[in-house]
Amino acid sequence: MAKVNIKPLEDKILVQANEAETTTASGLVIPDTAKEKPQEGTVVAVGPGRWDEDGEKRIPLDVAEGDTVIYSKYGGTEIKYNGEEYLILSARDVLAVVSK
């Protein structure tokens, strides 16, 4: 995973989606038009967290760079940077962190 010069703001997370499956368990090739949108990816960068209600301190995020996360199917904003595709998610769009 290459270093990216994108720094998310507040409680935003920059994720690079893992590749979608290209074949089924039985060996059938899945055409591009029928592929499911991936819901798992690797965290590339993390914002500093959002401010608490008093605006006095930041609330840290539960994820860190390098974590593998599962996120909402339709969450986030897709971007392209230096030929790579990324997703900017809100911390609320992250459903789970995958343990290694």
From Swiss-Prot:
N-terminus is acetylated by RimI. It is found in: Cytoplasm. GO terms for cellular component: cytosol; extracellular region; peptidoglycan-based cell wall; plasma membrane. The modification N-acetylalanine is found at A2. Signal peptide: none annotated. GO terms for biological process: cellular response to heat; chaperone cofactor-dependent protein refolding; regulation of DNA-templated transcription; response to antibiotic; response to heat. It holds the Pfam family Cpn10. Keywords: Acetylation, Chaperone, Cytoplasm, Isopeptide bond, Stress response, Ubl conjugation. The keyword Acyltransferase does not apply. Its main location: cytoplasm. GO terms for molecular function: ATP binding; metal ion binding; protein folding chaperone; protein-folding chaperone binding; unfolded protein binding; zymogen binding. Heptamer of 7 subunits arranged in a domed ring. 2 rings join in their base to form a spherical cage-like structure; both heptamers and tetradecamers exist in solution. Interacts with RimI. Belongs to the GroES chaperonin family. Together with the chaperonin GroEL, plays an essential role in assisting protein folding. The GroEL-GroES system forms a nano-cage that allows encapsulation of the non-native substrate proteins and provides a physical environment optimized to promote and accelerate protein folding. GroES binds to the apical surface of the GroEL ring, thereby capping the opening of the GroEL channel. This is Co-chaperonin GroES. The gene is groES.
